[in-house]
């Protein structure tokens, strides 16, 4: 062995580098994953701390960018020739697959972060050859730099593609800020092989939150369930997967038909010719995957899905030909050159009606996938499809609206939309709230209102738990929920078990009386919204709890400006998915789940953008404030509830207490005096994890020290303020 291959310190061979070798999770695979609370830190972000993407985007001349995209789409490149001389269909697929990962269950996925650039999404089988689309766009991204994110550029390119082929879009909004590392928090499934479907149990019951039928797909298998060409069964899969991304039946038909009006499928040969995906490709391939040895590997020889052919006679022009073909022919099952199941007109009908994508001397018959056939054969989709066939204007409007929803669903409220093409129409799925149309309360008013709230019969626990319930619906994944709008007083939130409807009604009635008295006393236009008053009540409760603990100078920040949404502005079905099935901060768990309560706590904390220290201090603080659902005493490790003390940590870390589960389920535990056996406390897994997990115990020890009381109060107030304002995009 040469000296160059020897480690300079030990003389042994250098086999691994920093970060390599057996990891903790290899030894303890069930270890609580706190890494998802440390994602996207400034250490991974190359931009300056002062960089403001919204301001950078506003400096962009969007018309210039669009013109560059228009020009690019018709400039075919030899290294990846454009089908029909137009990259528009490829860009539509790229944008669709960027947005189409969104699912309503947890709001994760979607186009909002540009995550198609990273694993695993950049290497999913369903995203084959979309690496070429991004590489084609690189000169435009390079030209405009930080002024437009990849996330925005991919969606804008899809819109430009539609416009360049004769379609009038509903609009476009910028404001999607790029991430710089994969999103490790998103659960895409437990399968270990591409296209695995262990996510199904029983009679094809799809695992909760997942929005695709197989690992590595966006929605459904185009050949049918597990490749079986059954259009009716495919329709059931389509309805479930599209429904899980917030699309109804009409939107589903419009999106399917609208997207398949353009471009073609690629299956010129056996996929055995196709090389590894980008993440598995060679270093010299430079992030390009799926290199094919079939012929030239591109153009007429391209292999992507394995299905081969186009749906319409003019694949680069918006028209109604998709439906004309779907209902104009009778279809029969056949195989593509790659061996994939697809459908062609019976008896050779339609031959020579579709141009070849690259060879002007060749023509073809149209094709349909099994998923397309569901648009005709599914008993619900079929009448919608026939209506669109007979009413092209309805189809165009439905597709425009559904495409806008698809590509903007995870952006949150309209206040985050940027650019000159933001549509004026307010849409119910945007969770609208009224604009502020009154003078806001000032510091003197805030002090007066806090005194009036504390003078009522409401307890610290009631004030804190109501404010928390109002704010904690927020999820950063799709920017939905939060305290703005005061939707906790509306259906469905007012009836959620976790919100303690009876107590909630009492608190709201009391706060409404305070609101009415204050507003009626104003001579001018000054008003306080109930949304603001709910949060202010929580802040007043925290301040009172601090005083109860001997901290008289604590002031919880409060920023007015929330407004009250109406029931008409609130889609009950859409908001139902925000109902917390588990909220470890309130020691609440509805039902039983395959995952542990502590994992659900971390999941919730990640959606709230909390760090591990913030999660820790909030749990400890909310416990001593007696904010559990139903005022359950699990985890209330204090003899002075409603006082903002660090007692939770002091007593959890007390070695004179020994813990044991109360049942085989190991969900509730009793803490008994180690010597006498006397019962001292009860707690849940969410409580005990802060003493059991070594990382969380280290944080608990910080707050359990004798000199940490002031730090605890300060950190709790800061974390509380953060949660109360997560949906205040107007403050950014």
UniProtKB/Swiss-Prot annotation:
Disulfide bonds: none annotated. Its EC number is 1.11.1.21. InterPro entries: Catalase_peroxidase, Haem_peroxidase, Haem_peroxidase_sf, Peroxidases_AS. Belongs to the peroxidase family. Peroxidase/catalase subfamily. This is Catalase-peroxidase. Bifunctional enzyme with both catalase and broad-spectrum peroxidase activity. Formation of the three residue Trp-Tyr-Met cross-link is important for the catalase, but not the peroxidase activity of the enzyme. The record marks 93 as: Transition state stabilizer. GO terms for molecular function: catalase activity; heme binding; metal ion binding. The active site is at residue 97. Homodimer or homotetramer. Its cofactor is heme b. It comes from Acaryochloris marina (strain MBIC 11017). One of its GO terms (biological process) is cellular response to hydrogen peroxide.
């Amino acid at each position: 062995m040469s000296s160059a291959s020897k480690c300079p310190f030990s003389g042994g061979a250098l086999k691994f580098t920093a970060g390599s070798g057996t990891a903790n999770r290899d030894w303890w695979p069930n270890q609580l994953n706190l890494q998802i609370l440390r994602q996207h830190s400034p250490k991974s972000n190359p931009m300056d701390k002062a960089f403001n993407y919204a301001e950078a985007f506003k400096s962009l001349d969007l018309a210039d960018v669009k013109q560059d995209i228009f020009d690019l789409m018709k400039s075919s490149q030899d290294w990846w020739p454009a089908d029909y001389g137009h990259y528009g269909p490829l860009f539509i697929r790229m944008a669709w697959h960027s947005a189409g990962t969104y699912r309503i269950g947890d709001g994760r996925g979607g186009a909002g972060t540009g995550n198609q650039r990273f694993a695993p999404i950049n290497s999913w089988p369903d995203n084959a050859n979309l690496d070429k689309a991004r590489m084609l766009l690189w000169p435009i991204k390079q030209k405009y730099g930080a002024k437009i994110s990849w996330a925005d550029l991919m969606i804008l390119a899809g819109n430009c593609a539609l416009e360049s082929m004769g379609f009038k879009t509903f609009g476009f909004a910028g404001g999607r800020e790029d991430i710089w590392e994969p999103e490790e928090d998103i659960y895409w499934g437990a399968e270990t092989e591409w296209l695995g479907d262990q996510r199904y149990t029983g009679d094809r019951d799809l695992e909760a939150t997942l929005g695709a039928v197989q690992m590595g797909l966006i929605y459904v298998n185009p050949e049918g369930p597990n490749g079986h060409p059954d259009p009716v069964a495919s329709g059931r899969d389509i309805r479930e997967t599209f429904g899980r991304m917030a699309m109804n039946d009409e939107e589903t038909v419009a999106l399917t038909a609208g997207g398949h009006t353009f471009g073609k499928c690629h299956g010129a040969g056996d996929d055995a010719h196709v090389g590894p995906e980008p993440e598995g490709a060679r270093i010299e391939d430079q992030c390009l995957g799926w290199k094919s040895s079939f012929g030239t590997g591109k153009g007429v020889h391209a292999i992507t899905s394995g299905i081969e052919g186009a749906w319409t006679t003019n694949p680069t022009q918006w028209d109604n030909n998709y439906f004309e073909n779907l209902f104009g022919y009778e279809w029969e099952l056949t195989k593509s050159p790659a061996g994939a199941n697809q459908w062609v007109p019976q008896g050779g009908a339609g031959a020579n009606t579709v141009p070849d994508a690259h060879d002007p001397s060749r023509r073809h018959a149209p094709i349909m996938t099994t998923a397309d056939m569901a648009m005709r054969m599914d008993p619900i989709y079929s009448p919608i499809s026939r209506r669109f066939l007979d009413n092209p204007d309805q189809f165009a409007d439905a597709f425009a609206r559904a495409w806008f929803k698809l590509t903007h669903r995870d952006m949150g409220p309209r206040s985050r939309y940027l650019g000159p093409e933001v549509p004026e129409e307010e849409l119910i799925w945007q969770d609208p709230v009224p604009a502020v149309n009154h003078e806001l309360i000032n510091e003197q008013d805030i002090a007066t209102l806090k005194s009036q709230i504390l003078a009522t019969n409401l307890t610290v626990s009631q004030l804190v738990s109501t404010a928390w319930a109002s704010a904690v619906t927020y999820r950063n994944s799709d920017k939905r929920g939060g305290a703005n709008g005061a939707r906790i007083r509306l259906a469905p939130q007012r009836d959620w078990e976790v919100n303690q409807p009876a107590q909630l009604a009492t608190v709201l009635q009391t706060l409404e009386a305070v609101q009415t008295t204050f507003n009626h006393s104003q001579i001018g236009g000054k008003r306080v919204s109930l949304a603001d008053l709910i949060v202010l009540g929580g802040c007043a409760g925290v301040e009172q709890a601090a005083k109860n603990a001997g901290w008289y100078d604590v002031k919880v920040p409060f920023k007015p400006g929330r407004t009250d949404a109406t029931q008409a502005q609130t889609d009950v079905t859409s908001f139902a998915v925000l109902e917390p099935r588990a909220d470890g901060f309130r020691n609440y768990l509805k039902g039983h789940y395959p995952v542990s309560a502590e994992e659900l706590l971390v999941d919730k904390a990640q959606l709230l953008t909390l760090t591990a220290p913030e999660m820790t201090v909030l749990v400890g603080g909310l416990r001593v404030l007696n904010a559990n659902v139903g005022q359950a005493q699990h985890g209330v490790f204090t003899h002075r509830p409603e006082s903002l003390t660090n007692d939770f940590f002091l007593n959890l870390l007390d070695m004179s207490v020994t813990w044991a589960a109360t049942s085989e389920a190991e969900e509730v535990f009793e803490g008994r005096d180690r010597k006498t056996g006397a019962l001292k406390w009860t707690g849940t897994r969410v409580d005990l994890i802060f003493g059991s997990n070594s990382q969380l115990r280290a944080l608990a020890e910080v707050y359990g020290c004798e000199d940490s009381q002031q730090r605890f109060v300060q950190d709790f107030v800061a974390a509380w303020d953060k949660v109360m304002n997560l949906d205040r995009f107007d403050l950014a």
